Amino acid sequence: MGRGSPRLVLVASADSSTAISYRGRIAPSPTGYLHVGHARTFFTAWQRARDAGGTLVLRMDDLDAERSRSAYAEAALEDLRWLGIDWQEGPDVGGPHAPYTQSQRGGLYRAAWRTLLARGFLYPCRCSRKDLATAAAAPHEADPGPDAADDEPLYPGTCRPPLRGAPLHGAAPWTKAEVEAGGANWRFRVPDGEAIEFADGNLGPQCFVAGVDFGDFVVWRREGTPSYQLACVVDDAAMRITEVVRGADLLKSTARQILLNRALGHANPAWHHCALVVDRNGRRLAKRHDALSLRTLRQRGLTPMNILSAELPVEV
């Protein structure tokens, strides 16, 4: 839960103004083999879609061009089918909201970036990761995403204009020519002190305070690609997702995405954050833990029931 003394409260709830059948999604990132945590979260998403008589969408979140591999994408589809998970829309089966691979949806993300820019929510930032790490006394600045803990340090406001929507060329140290030339990271200016509240379907009421629990965050990178936060919001809206099922490490990302939805005029989906799979020391498992990749566990003779069971040992 968030801290601080908020001056405004944004209570976000799933939009119910239009009757729409359940639409869930699973979004593997092909930067490595799926592990036990992915399996359990994706199975929960599949089960909730099935129980609701709805549609499950598979979206390949492959925006990390340096680490994404087609072999990992193919392995993810195979592992998911082995678990008994099927989907009605996706890169392999098509559907009305294609393409279902993020690297092919760049035009949608750029349009959303332009909308946010025109509405005064963004500003350019020339700070390097080294600058931010030094300012925050943190080892790194992460872009919270499917494979990263949601621990982005607070942005110190180095490049933030004094007022939202202020002329960007008047915000030191940028000149008008530099802004027009691009080559910047673009940050979303959060409403400092506003409490973002939402009800999670699994973990209950949540509250995070903008400017306290999270700060201005990157939505567009200097390389010309969207961040996880922006791409996720754009795709969930375009694909008409009604409930997002994902790991509890992304709770804070939900608060950020609620702000993006409001800025873009999107309805909020419902949220269901699953408990994380941790090791015996309480550390979150990630793709670097090869011993718990589905590939390795399958080779050791484990069955889908073993992997989805709460009794599966975390060190095999």
What are these regions (language model features)?
Residues 1-33, 51-56, 83, 171-179, ...:
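Non-catalytic terminal extensions that flank enzyme cores
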Residues 88-91, 268-271, 305-307:
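Short, surface-exposed acidic
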Residues 130-285, 293-298:
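Active-site cores that bind ATP or allylic diphosphates and position pyrophosphate for catalysis
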Residues 79, 112, 135, 162, ...:
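Residues that form generic nucleotide/phosphate-binding pockets
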Residues 8-144, 248-249, 255-266:
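N-terminal Rossmann-like or analogous alpha/beta NTP/dinucleotide-binding catalytic cores
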Residues 24-27, 58, 95-98, 114, ...:
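Generic, low-specificity signal for short hydrophobic/alpha-helical stretches with a mild N-terminal bias
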